[in-house]
Structure formats: structure tokens, C-alpha cells
């Protein structure tokens, strides 16, 4: 760098030289000042274990390319007795054809690494459920290996409703902070509502095909379930590799709810049948990689349905596959053998795989209790 100094050693020259030396010393101090770990880390030092967040890539894989902008299908208004249907069902019918939405937050390196992913925990959450996600990260959703079998975690989110714009902006900032810090958020540009849970399943299947095609198994669950992760891994280890698996709490002979006030309401216009195909309760179920691929193929030819777990049963039926039951998966809680035992007794949960439903503080307490060296259970502690 040049300084405006003459060559003769006048007073001005000396002053100029002193200014220059001071500037160089200050510059050197800044270069040597300690930086935060995030600043010092080079891209080569990032690992799949750490945050792998990113907004959706500019050029995503073909499986993640969104469809054309979603426009209401006016012909849905011709549905029989359309005006008598609840507004939410009317909207579902108008936008039922929209199946591919933009990915707002991606986790492109979630399944990177040579060892592959043995179990991917895919948790359906809502933007405002920050506390639930944090407790899952600290407890059963820890990204670690069980006996050399890597377990990874993802949260599946839509966007908050437009009713309160200021609240929606704050939640968007919250999700962005989480995604950058943890790299475990997938968020799509559709409203996070009960009727759109099916879209989370479909978009997850597309994401798996693009980003994690070699994952051995998948656990799909709500963000208020408790999972005994070691038990899940132990069960999956015993499964033949590369085979069909779709296991949970079987729902056989389940009938559509015709009461319009119920959130599970399904009118005959959407499902004229008297009973759904056999499916597993959506609170939590397990499936294999091959089954996920078969479901994705079947879903292309299966019209969207507002009850997500029943929709999975429809896709299984179309694929020629059947779900199986597992007594360790309890989406409706545990049935106690006697009134003397508390439903929060950790001995009641030590052999289970998944239980619904838990508050965040209960999740932490149960996790600590089950992993306490002082836990002692006798044979009388069983669930039915």
C-alpha cells in the first residue's frame, strides 16, 4: 500500500512513516485476532454429524423440482352438494391436484457419508412447536450410532397460516434459526394444517428419493410421541435387509367419519366406501427403504386424501403390500393391567418402541428415567 510521503526525512516524513507503521501493525493484529469456531472451520471440516442446513438449492434434483404454481380447480365447484361442505373440505377439493410445492429449507447433506443411514427419524411438526423439537433433539432424536448403526433426524414442516402476518414472520425467523443451527428441518411452501399432513408424507418420499435413497429404515411420527430409539434399532436389526416393512398399530375396518364438526370428517364425495383399507395409525410407524419407494410410485396414481394415515393404507393397497402390527408401537397410549400402577412408570415403557402422547417435559423425564442406572423393574411391570 502506498503512502503520500516524500523521500526526505523531514518532520512530515517521519509523521507519515509512523502513521504507516501503525496502520500495518493494526492490520496484523486483526489478522491474528482469535475467531469463533464457526469462522475458523473450513468447509472440508464439516461432517454429516453437524448442521447441514441450507435454503433449498438453486438447482435441486428432479425429484424436488416444484410443480407449476398451485391454482384453484374451478371444476371442483361442480361437486355434488359442494356448497353444503365445510369450507376446509371445499378448499381441499379445489387444490387437491396440487402435489409438488417449493422446498423452503433443505438438509441436502443429511445422509452424506460413507456409512449410510440405518434409521431416519422423520418427525411431523408445526412451526410453532419449537419446544417439542428441542426436547426431541435432546432425547430420543439424538443423531448418533447404536451399535454402529447411524440414526439421523428430520423435522417436517409446512408454513404458518396467513391469519397473523406478524406472527408468521416471527415463526419464519425461528425456523430459519433452527435450520441453520441444527440442519434438521425440511419446510415446504404449503400451509401447515391437519388436512395437509398427507402432503408431508408425499414430499418426504420425494426427498428420500433425491437425498437419501439408501436409508435402510424410516420412522414416521408426530412431535408428541416418545420413542425408545435403542429398542427401535434392535427391532429393525432383526429384519431381513431389502424387504418390505410397514409396521405400527393396525387399523382394521376403520370407517370414515361423517360428522362435519369432526376434524376427521370425510364426506361421501371424497370417499364413498364404508371402510378404509387396512393402515397403521399415523401417530408413529416404521417402514423400510424399499417400501418407501413402492409407496412413492403408488402415490402417483392415488388421488390425495385428507386423512394421512388412511392415505398410506390406500397406497399400500395399490402397491399390493400389507401393513403389519407391532405391539410395541402404542399411538393410543398404554393400557395398564391394574389401577395401582402409574401410567408414567418408566418400567411400563422399557420394552416399548413408541408411545403417544407426551408433553415436552414428560418426554425429558421419561428419557432420563429409562436411562438411569438406578432403574429397577420386576416382572409385574407389563402393558397389555
From Swiss-Prot:
GO MF entries: acetylgalactosaminyl-O-glycosyl-glycoprotein beta-1,3-N-acetylglucosaminyltransferase activity; beta-1,3-galactosyl-O-glycosyl-glycoprotein beta-1,3-N-acetylglucosaminyltransferase activity; galactosyltransferase activity; N-acetyl-beta-D-glucosaminide beta-(1,3)-galactosyltransferase activity; UDP-glycosyltransferase activity
Pathway(s) per entry: Protein modification; protein glycosylation
GO cellular component: Golgi membrane; membrane
Annotated InterPro entries: Glyco_trans_31
EC code: 2.4.1.147
Parts of the chain that traverse the membrane: 13-31
Residue ranges, Cytoplasmic side: 1-12
Tissue: Present in stomach and colon (at protein level). Restricted in the stomach, colon and small intestine, where core 3 structure is present.
Membrane topology field: Single-pass type II membrane protein
Keywords: Glycoprotein, Glycosyltransferase, Golgi apparatus, Membrane, Signal-anchor, Transferase, Transmembrane, Transmembrane helix
Compartment(s) where it occurs, according to its Swiss-Prot or TrEMBL record: Golgi apparatus membrane
Glycan attachment positions: 73, 77, 196
Keyword Transmembrane helix appears in the UniProt entry: yes
Misc note: Injection into nude mice significantly suppress lung metastasis, indicating that the core structures of O-glycans are profoundly involved in the metastatic capacity of cancer cells.
Protein name: Acetylgalactosaminyl-O-glycosyl-glycoprotein beta-1,3-N-acetylglucosaminyltransferase
Natural source organism: Homo sapiens (Human)
Gene it is expressed from: B3GNT6
Amino acid at each position: 500500500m502506498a503512502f503520500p510521503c516524500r523521500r526526505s526525512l523531514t518532520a512530515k516524513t517521519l509523521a507519515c512513516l509512523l502513521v504507516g507503521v501503525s496502520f500495518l501493525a493494526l492490520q496484523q493484529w486483526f489478522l491474528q485476532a482469535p475467531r469463533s469456531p464457526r469462522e475458523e472451520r473450513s468447509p472440508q471440516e464439516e461432517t454429516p454429524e453437524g448442521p447441514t442446513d441450507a435454503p433449498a438449492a438453486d438447482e435441486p434434483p428432479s425429484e424436488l423440482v416444484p410443480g407449476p404454481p398451485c391454482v384453484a380447480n374451478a371444476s371442483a365447484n361442480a361437486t355434488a352438494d359442494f356448497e353444503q361442505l365445510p369450507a376446509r373440505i371445499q378448499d381441499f377439493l379445489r387444490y387437491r391436484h396440487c402435489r409438488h410445492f417449493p422446498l423452503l429449507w433443505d438438509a441436502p447433506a443429511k445422509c452424506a457419508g460413507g456409512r449410510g443411514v440405518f434409521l431416519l427419524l422423520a418427525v411431523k411438526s408445526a412451526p410453532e412447536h419449537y419446544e417439542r423439537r428441542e426436547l426431541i433433539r435432546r432425547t430420543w432424536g439424538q443423531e448418533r450410532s447404536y451399535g454402529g448403526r447411524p440414526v439421523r433426524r428430520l423435522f417436517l414442516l409446512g408454513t404458518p397460516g396467513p391469519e397473523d402476518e406478524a406472527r408468521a414472520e416471527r415463526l419464519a425467523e425461528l425456523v430459519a434459526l433452527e435450520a441453520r443451527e441444527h440442519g434438521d428441518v425440511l419446510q415446504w411452501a404449503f400451509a401447515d394444517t391437519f388436512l395437509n399432513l398427507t402432503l408431508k408424507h408425499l414430499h418426504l418420499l420425494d426427498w428420500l428419493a433425491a437425498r437419501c435413497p439408501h436409508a435402510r429404515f424410516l420412522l414416521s411420527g408426530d412431535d408428541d410421541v416418545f420413542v425408545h430409539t435403542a429398542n427401535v434399532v434392535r427391532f429393525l436389526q432383526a429384519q431381513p435387509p431389502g424387504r418390505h416393512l410397514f409396521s405400527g398399530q393396525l387399523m382394521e375396518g376403520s370407517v370414515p367419519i361423517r360428522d362435519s364438526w369432526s376434524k376427521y370428517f370425510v364426506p361421501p364425495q371424497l370417499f364413498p366406501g364404508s371402510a378404509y383399507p387396512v393402515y397403521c395409525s399415523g401417530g408413529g410407524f416404521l417402514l423400510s427403504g424399499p417400501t418407501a419407494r413402492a409407496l412413492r410410485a403408488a402415490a402417483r396414481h392415488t388421488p390425495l386424501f385428507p386423512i394421512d394415515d388412511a392415505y398410506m393404507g390406500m397406497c399400500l393397497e395399490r402397491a399390493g403390500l400389507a401393513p403389519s402390527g407391532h405391539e410395541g408401537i402404542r399411538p393410543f397410549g398404554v393400557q395398564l393391567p391394574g389401577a395401582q400402577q402409574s401410567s408414567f412408570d418408566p418400567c411400563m415403557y422399557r420394552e416399548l418402541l413408541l408411545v403417544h402422547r407426551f408433553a415436552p417435559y414428560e418426554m425429558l423425564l421419561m428419557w432420563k428415567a429409562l436411562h438411569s442406572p438406578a432403574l429397577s423393574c420386576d416382572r409385574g411391570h407389563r402393558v397389555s
